[in-house]
Amino acid sequence: MRSLLVGALMAPTLALSQVVGLGTTPVGATFQLATGVAKVVSDKGGVQMRTQPMAGAAQYAPLVNKGDIDFGISNVPELHYLVKGEVIVDNRPHPDLRMVARLVPWYNGLVVKKDSPLRTLKDLKGQPVPAGFTGNPLGRVLITGYLANAGMTFDDTRQVPVPSFPRMFDAFKQQQTATSIATIGMAQLKEWESALGGVRFLQFDPSPAAAAAVTRHVPHSRVVEVKPGPGKTGVDTPTHILVYDYALWVNARVPEEVVAKVAQALHDHPAELKATSPLWAEFDTAQLGRDVGIPYHPGAVKVYQSKGLWKR
């Protein structure tokens, strides 16, 4: 975070020292991605990027919007809500957020113990499900969408209040809940494999009506079939789950040359990114400038144009 004296005189980012902050969650899959971005940008991009963990994007997006933190990371559905000031941050738009890069597809859903009798989202009726998420509203939004796929709401479950994703992870590990939000490739899946004897993703309903019910709550998402394979803990048979994109974003006033260095580092070092976490398995440099419905920062646009990746 830049000093108050510098902040009073210049645009966001410590332009002289090239030190920038990256807002992220404290644990979980988002933090895994953020640490990978920060490592590659710091090692290869000529910009020192330091992660600044907070409870969730609802906490760090206002700071990025003001320029107190330079960069942020989140999924694209959440970013849309943040920019518009809807659902996650009611009536608090964040108009100064700009895209830097589309990072990876994010395969997510709800997991249960491998030996659980629950097989589909519909089986969660009457089961203990994490709820509340006062510290990170994204959890409430996602589970609302998941349950909608099964024609249910939180009222159809036994709600177990959790304030945050870390508390949700712990509640599931302690079997205070029957399920937890999870993402293919996240570190917690391996932890649960050991502690719980295995985990398994619950099946989504892929029918058009059921898939549309999810996207009403989780925009820019889709239901897809994922087949078993290396790094896909929790997917033992072909399983329908949710997917959306993850994004790196920035304050609109961060200098173009700084954003360009970040975008260039991501483009030029895919192997280094993939080495940081299984979450990067499907990272594709050709998709860095993908249109996700949010304007891109001109510093990133220039890089993608120079690489022939900007198609609009």
Feature locations, PLM:
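Bilobed "Venus flytrap"/periplasmic-binding protein-like clamshell domains
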Residues: 19-44, 48-50, 106-170, 174, ...
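Pocket-lining segment of extracytoplasmic ligand-binding domains
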Residues: 76-78, 85-88, 114-116, 153-155, ...
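Bacterial N-terminal signal peptides that target proteins for export
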Residues: 1-8
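Short beta-strand-centered segments that line the small-molecule binding cleft or hinge
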Residues: 80-85, 96-102
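An extracytoplasmic/periplasmic, membrane-proximal ligand-sensing/linker region
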Residues: 33, 167, 174-175, 183-201, ...
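N-terminal signal peptide c-region/cleavage motif recognized by signal peptidases
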Residues: 12-17
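Ligand-binding clefts/hinges and TM-proximal coupling segments of bilobed small-molecule sensing domains
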Residues: 126-145, 220-282, 292
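N-terminal (or domain-start) structured segment
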Residues: 18-82, 87-90
